[in-house]
């Protein structure tokens, strides 16, 4: 039996538009982002996808993308589970900074390493910083010492995988069709795990906003196939635009 899993990165956020490092900062969608969410829902509807359960982060840009997509799908009733483990990678001291200005200051190669390497985190945010998640009530039930002040993709994967194994994978194994709406790096982490790609290969992977990525999995959740829904050239162009965000102007 083929299991179906869709990974969907949130639509354009205000800080995507502003070309700023976002991480765990809770910024909302732009009007374009809301349109991308609806368009993603239409692509999934045209594909004939009938979901059984959905998962998202505790950040509004992902939550609102999921809501917009489900509305277009006419599946608003779907059970939705939110977890901090699906949050974007924490960008530490880079959060809020302009990507192009940071590239001009530190060099494009350094910014590419911070953005896309596997195991090198950006400079950490101090725990006393008001923006540290330890000061955010949505994480009040978690051990403050376990909350990140920065993350690499490797540590993001360590954060995401327990939720995959404990919550998402059992639903897929039970034959459920699953939608995960999250963020560029939490989805890159899942992509790396599912496709078992190397640390070097993940450096070149960019996930575009608002375009559903459909995986077909076997009974053991091994990948049989995967593809972006809609126009593959449009997905390619959108991924290239993500890659270019870290370049100096």
UniProtKB/Swiss-Prot annotation:
Residues marked Transition state stabilizer (site): 183
InterPro entries recorded: His_Pase_superF_clade-1, His_PPase_superfam, PG/BPGM_mutase_AS, Phosphogly_mut1
Class of the enzyme per the UniProt entry, highest EC level: isomerase
The keyword Lyase is annotated on this UniProt entry: no
Active site residues of this protein: 10 (tele-phosphohistidine intermediate), 88 (proton donor/acceptor)
Protein name as catalogued: 2,3-bisphosphoglycerate-dependent phosphoglycerate mutase
Species of origin: Xanthomonas campestris pv. campestris (strain ATCC 33913 / DSM 3586 / NCPPB 528 / LMG 568 / P 25)
Biological process annotations from GO: gluconeogenesis; glycolytic process
Its EC number(s): 5.4.2.11
UniProt family annotation: Belongs to the phosphoglycerate mutase family. BPG-dependent PGAM subfamily.
Domain of life: Bacteria
Keywords: Gluconeogenesis, Glycolysis, Isomerase
Assembly and binders: Homodimer.
Pathway terms, separated by semicolons: Carbohydrate degradation; glycolysis; pyruvate from D-glyceraldehyde 3-phosphate: step 3/5
Protein task: Catalyzes the interconversion of 2-phosphoglycerate and 3-phosphoglycerate.
Catalytic activity: (2R)-2-phosphoglycerate = (2R)-3-phosphoglycerate
HAMAP family on file: PGAM_GpmA
Example of a GO MF term: phosphoglycerate mutase activity
Residues that bind substrate: 9-16, 22-23, 61, 88-91, 99, 115-116, 184-185
């Amino acid at each position: 039996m083929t299991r179906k899993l869709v990974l969907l990165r949130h639509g354009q956020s205000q800080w995507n538009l502003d070309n700023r490092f976002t991480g765990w900062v809770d910024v909302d969608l732009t009007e374009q982002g809301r349109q991308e969410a609806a368009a993603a829902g239409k692509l999934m509807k045209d594909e004939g996808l009938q979901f059984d359960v959905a998962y998202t982060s505790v950040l509004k840009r992902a939550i609102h993308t999921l809501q917009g997509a489900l509305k277009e799908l006419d599946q608003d009733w779907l059970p939705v589970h939110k977890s901090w483990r699906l949050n974007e990678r924490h960008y530490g001291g880079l959060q809020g900074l302009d990507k192009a200005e940071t590239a001009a200051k530190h060099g494009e190669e350094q910014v590419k390493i911070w953005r896309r390497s596997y195991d090198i985190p950006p400079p950490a945010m101090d725990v006393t910083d008001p923006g540290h998640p330890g000061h955010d009530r949505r994480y009040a039930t978690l051990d403050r010492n376990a909350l990140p002040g920065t993350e690499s993709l490797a540590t993001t994967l360590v954060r995401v995988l327990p939720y995959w194994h404990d919550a998402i994978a059992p639903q897929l194994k039970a034959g459920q069709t699953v939608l995960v709406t999250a963020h560029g790096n939490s989805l890159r982490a899942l992509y790396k795990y599912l496709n078992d790609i190397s640390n070097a290969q993940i450096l070149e992977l960019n996930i575009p906003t608002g375009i559903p990525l459909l995986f077909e999995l076997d009974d053991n959740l091994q990948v049989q196939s995967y593809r972006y829904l809609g126009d593959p050239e449009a997905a390619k162009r959108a991924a290239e635009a993500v890659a270019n965000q870290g370049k100096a102007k």
